[in-house]
Regions:
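Acidic, surface-exposed loops and disordered segments
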Residues: 1-157
Length: 157
């Protein structure tokens, strides 16, 4: 992604927790997969795009009711032995979020309000790897929902 595209995505990006039922087009999935391949080569991480969001985010208990309609997510995975794992996941994960934003998709970083054991079964997780976080991704309503506005107010003081 070029610098101008990044700067525009930085200005546009905001956390979105409500998604609409619309599959991400093949061209956009392919673009995200190319980005992931490049980032994994640069970082040594095992970032993944998963299109099985409904399996992971079904029901209230899996996300405390804070997410709705999740169809896809990025699994942010890396080696347990990497002393810089958290820093790398933060840096390269945000690049993924910006790439998704540039493609017209919404994103939300999720640290712990999902079923980690189920997620580990749904993704490609090797024995020496750790799932650090996920980023939900997909199409969102044009305007934030009332719930999203309230959550945003509570989390940004």
């Amino acid at each position: 992604m070029n610098q101008e595209r990044y700067l525009k995505a930085i200005d546009e990006r905001c956390s979105r927790r409500t998604y609409i039922t619309k599959d991400i087009e093949v061209e956009k999935v392919n673009s995200l997969q190319r980005c992931i391949k490049n980032l994994n080569e640069m970082s040594g991480l095992n970032l993944q795009l998963q299109l099985n969001g409904p399996k992971l985010f079904k029901g209230f208990s899996s996300s405390y009711g804070m997410l709705k309609g999740v169809g896809a997510y990025f699994a942010l995975v890396g080696s347990k032995d990497d002393k810089d794992l958290l820093e790398k996941v933060g840096y390269f994960g945000e690049i993924l979020a910006l790439e998704a934003t540039a493609l017209g998709l919404g994103t939300c970083w999720i640290g712990g309000t999902y079923d980690r054991k189920l997620c580990a079964k749904l993704i490609d997780l090797k024995e020496n790897e750790e799932l650090v976080a996920i980023i939900t991704v997909g199409y969102t309503p044009v305007d934030k929902t009332f719930k999203e506005k309230m959550i945003s107010k509570l989390s940004h003081r």
